[in-house]
Amino acid sequence: MDFSIKPLDAKSTIASIKTGCIAVAVFEDKKLSAAAQALDQKGGISAALKSGDISGKAGSTLLLRGVSGVAAERVLLVGLGKEDPVSEKDFSSAVQAVARAFTSLGATEAVIALPLDAVAARDAAWSIRCTILNTRDASYRFDSLKSKKEPAPAGVKKIVFAVSAASTAIAKDAIAQAVAQANGIDLTKDLGNLPANVCTPTYLANTAKKMAKEFKLQVEVLDRKQLQALKMGSFLSVTNGSVEPPKFIVLKHMGGKAKDAPVVLVGKGITFDSGGISLKPGAAMDEMKYDMGGAASVLGTMRAIAELKLKLNVIVVIPTCENMPSGSATKPGDIVTSMSGQTIEVLNTDAEGRLVLCDALTYVERFKPAAVIDVATLTGACITALGHHNSGLFTRSDDAHDALANELLAAGKASGDTAWRMPIEDSYQEQLKSNFADMANIGGPAGGAVTAACFLERYTKKYTWAHLDIAGTAWKSGAAKGSTGRPVPLLTSFLIQRAQTAR
């Protein structure tokens, strides 16, 4: 999919654009947008609206052919709901409808002339990014492992945004950001959708190496012997049951000043989670290939910011392995020593994500980070608490952590990839007490998402930290089964804003 802009001025008008299709907006009160009015020279569009052929409700569409006085072959009327102001939800519904309509058109090029600056509290750049991300999402396919691939859908391959001449620079920047973000989302989806016999820890490491070569990043992959030398006993305890060798990936984009402290993203990379000796139920266990969603999302985020050449220092760290049962697997009741020196009683081997993350969170101290954000499909309890709409955001409660939380929440809202802040309090730490070690790896059934975050918090005392639990948002089940690409939009928006602030 190719995206570009068409600046409009006195000489180049909406009606004079020669293209396969032009999309314009109508509203619920049977009112035409400015672009629709410009195309309604002979009254055909207003007649369709008055006759009730299109309601104007957000997401409604009507395709017209051969509109008199219009150079475009087709005009796609798109409902935007209430006019003043247009809500984010209604605009998103409208562009999703446009994306669906474009996939079935007989045209290869189309122009979008929606009122990009009409969304409440949002600018044209936001509307362009929203449109591109929805269009790319609608066109995403994962069929690389099918012997007989479905033919690629016909339809629009090039989308042009009609913008005012004054908005040209802003529109170009918005397109570049959205395309890079969409490329990162697609990578995250592809990695998540691959089966665990393909997307192994070694595969993730090779993906990082390829990305480093393509975008001139720095990469290091540590193996088992190196992890043993670092005394990562907690991480390694999870790897004991699998024949797949563990990997510890460090990928660096040093786009900022040499003296600037980096933002570190830590992604949980369990490429298949059987639960280990604490074996999961068989139903839907295939979906545990998605337990590397954190790793996939931080790789996708790194791809996006590398493509943008973001002027910010960002380091991605991924501890990756399988969690499998075998004669050599870690057993419930085993006690392991983490890289930090703290000991952990493993009461449940299916609470393994925190065991790999805690050593990674200790490792990243060496970078003296400006902030650390770990991303993990960590707990089913987070799904119980928040469903599949919001990721769970956990931080400590002080000025620095409140500021980081607010940045992430704002990035989530701006990108449509929302999170909800959850508590971390000392009272929950009591649930992690062990009679035999410094802590247990589970805290009982109550508040499971919170106690998991509290466990991680014990390893983050030397820097500002946030934890994103994406167990409910990283993938979908059922007929629409597949990786969502979240939270790449949130993370890239956060990092772009950080880079702009650092200028």
Curated annotation (Swiss-Prot):
Its EC number is 3.4.11.1, 3.4.11.10. It comes from the Bacteria. Its cofactor is Mn(2+). The active site is at residues 280, 354. One of its GO terms (molecular function) is manganese ion binding. The keyword Protease applies. Mn(2+) 2 binds at residues 268, 273, 291, 352. GO terms for biological process: proteolysis. It catalyses: Release of an N-terminal amino acid, Xaa-|-Yaa-, in which Xaa is preferably Leu, but may be other amino acids including Pro although not Arg or Lys, and Yaa may be Pro. Amino acid amides and methyl esters are also readily hydrolyzed, but rates on arylamides are exceedingly low; Release of an N-terminal amino acid, preferentially leucine, but not glutamic or aspartic acids. GO terms for cellular component: cytoplasm. Gene3D superfamilies: Leucine Aminopeptidase, subunit E, domain 1, Zn peptidases. InterPro entries: Leucine_aapep/pepB, Macro_dom-like, Peptidase_M17_C, Peptidase_M17_leu_NH2_pept, Peptidase_M17_N. Belongs to the peptidase M17 family. This is Probable cytosol aminopeptidase. The gene is pepA.
